[in-house]
Amino acid sequence: MWNKNRLTQMLSIEYPIIQAGMAGSTTPKLVASVSNSGGLGTIGAGYFNTQQLEDEIDYVRQLTSNSFGVNVFVPSQQSYTSSQIENMNAWLKPYRRALHLEEPVVKITEEQQFKCHIDTIIKKQVPVCCFTFGIPNESIIKRLKEANIKLIGTATSVDEAIANEKAGMDAIVAQGSEAGGHRGSFLKPKNQLPMVGTISLVPQIVDVVSIPVIAAGGIMDGRGVLASIVLGAEGVQMGTAFLTSQDSNASELLRDAIINSKETDTVVTKAFSGKLARGINNRFIEEMSQYEGDIPDYPIQNELTSSIRKAAANIGDKELTHMWSGQSPRLATTHPANTIMSNIINQINQIMQYK
């Protein structure tokens, strides 16, 4: 059976389909619906404070008794100068003026927030913890393992996958360059972040690690799931496929933008957050490409553009807000998450039946 392997056994799920933990876009209903359908629903905790994460976990548990996960951002060393922030604020001033916004006060609480998230995940006995932007330190991994929590890392290159396995991850998401949203890269060969496609990345990682590999990037339906399995993956992680679902927290602006976009409409940019992320191209990205200074690293740039993005989204201006999307938007639907899951499973079974 295509759905019975080490990953499904490890995560206590029926189907090796993971809903990506998209920060700001998951809801308890989405997470629970995927888990109730036999996959692994994942809370995107990247922008939550401690109370928000606790409430989200409790709400998910009211809706499902099945396994689920929490995705957290691993803090990185911020590299920035006061002049970088001043120059960026000057550049962003016209946008803020047009939207009647004040200049924000940048608050960096990433490290403390991450530690609180780990404490909450252990306290609440969340079955699975997923990491983006790097690998946590040895003591955190030890604490999570002692609590019998399964750990999933993210890799955008073979070297990152090897580092994840060496650190003690139980499985690895191989994130291809087709993936929407933030790149999970954390190793920089020759100062260039990896941009390897899913079909190239997955088998190369599979060949060098012994733990289960989860394919991600551009996978939207049963065909993508089966193709990933043929490449050696034992599961898939899908983001955009669930982002446009009725059950996600995506705005109608974002949902409509993805549904009506083409495979050539997305670009990879640092403009909004300071980390590379794939989204639908717009005026803000185009104009930021003309910025001659250094864009401050995440989370600085994320803080500096936050109010602009929120205000633009609130008035339906898709030109000044981020619209994360993978490279397969033509395959997106607005179905409920359980319908998306059943359609994927039915499509796989039909393909298997006729091959």
From Swiss-Prot:
GO MF annotation: an example: nitronate monooxygenase activity
Residues involved in FMN binding: N71, Q175, G180, G218, Q237, M238, G239, T240
Catalytic reaction equation(s): 3 propionate 3-nitronate + 3 O2 + H2O = 3 3-oxopropanoate + 2 nitrate + nitrite + H2O2 + 3 H(+)
Co-factor requirement: FMN
Superkingdom of origin organism: Bacteria
Gene3D superfamilies: Aldolase class I
EC number: 1.13.12.-
Cofactor note: Binds 1 FMN per subunit.
InterPro entries assigned: Aldolase_TIM, NMO
Keywords, alphabetical: Detoxification, Flavoprotein, FMN, Monooxygenase, Nucleotide-binding, Oxidoreductase
A Pfam match: NMO
Any single biological process term in GO: response to toxic substance
Note: P3N is a potent irreversible inhibitor of the key enzyme succinate dehydrogenase in the Krebs cycle and electron transport chain. P3N has been shown to be a toxic metabolite to bacteria, plants, fungi, mammals or any organism that uses succinate dehydrogenase.
Family membership noted in the UniProt record: Belongs to the nitronate monooxygenase family. NMO class I subfamily.
The protein's role, per its UniProt record: Nitronate monooxygenase that uses molecular oxygen to catalyze the oxidative denitrification of alkyl nitronates. Acts on propionate 3-nitronate (P3N), the presumed physiological substrate. Probably functions in the detoxification of P3N, a metabolic poison produced by plants and fungi as a defense mechanism.
The protein's name: Probable nitronate monooxygenase
